[in-house]
Amino acid sequence: MNVSVVLPSFNRARLLPITIPTYFQEDVSEVILVDDCSSDNTAEVVKELQTRFPTLRYFRNEVNSKQPYTQNVAISKVLSEYIDCGDDDSVLYPGSIRNLLNVMREKNADIVGGRALALFFPEQIDELDEFLSHYRNRIATEANQIVDLSTLSTNFTYTVKEPIKVPFCHASCLCKTQVAREMQFDVKIEGNAYREETDFLIRATLAGYTIYYTSSANQINLPSAMCSGGARSKNHRHWAENAIRNNDYFIDKNYDSMQKMFSLPRTKDEMKALFRVQIKKQVRQKHIMDFLERIGLFKIIYHIKHKFD
């Protein structure tokens, strides 16, 4: 067993009994949870979980220090050769870590990312096989279907027949510990920490490390209603402002190196402007989903759509 799972966490005590057990898979020697100074009963919940999972290690920041700093603390505590990056609001599908390890060894990769999916309704937690079946025929054959650097757009829901080399993957990934310690997460990425993983991973590629994407591993976000106390966050504008600010910082920091390696077709300013358009579209979509949910139509539309997939 030579994989450490790292889980930064903040005020997710009620989710941890659902998510943490899914990370104790074959090849996992420890799960490290770093509590970013939560105000809920995270410490008590973890203590109870430790009676079932003795290799669950718990650390707590003295002050709230945000996601990148907390990620770095977790990495510093790792005792294994490999790190699996988890989320406190996601479950990991059985067998995912073994499959990530197999791809890493077969491809001599430094980082391997899996699919990143999201449940829509709480009852889907007990129907993961059926949920995953909806993505079976969404097949990608080229890297730019998964990561398009010309627009910085991604789709980590695709099924692939063979692992595909990509410039970066989703945050849900297996990484060599020495690579993670060399790269480190950038603590200047603030607020909602948008682009923290993209920055970490693209810098790994720019440094000469190899990253692959596989659909044989699946990290699945819990429904947003469960993660936000029964309703989606309505502060979409604040989220978008944070995302734009962090994206601008990411582009200013990495554009020249990315341009040199990938010959990007857009200028730095064009990339920033395009992202603003994309974010505005996302916010509109979130408002529409909120409205459909309020009037009880979202679930009906979802099931009709997937009936014909």
Where are these regions (language model features)?
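Conserved donor NDP-sugar-binding/catalytic core segment of glycosyltransferases
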Residues: 95-140
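Glycine-rich, basic loop-to-helix element that forms the pyrophosphate-binding segment
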Residues: 61-78
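A recurrent flexible, glycine/aromatic-enriched loop bordering the glycosyltransferase active site
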Residues: 154-175
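A conserved acidic beta->alpha catalytic loop
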Residues: 22, 35-45, 63, 90-93
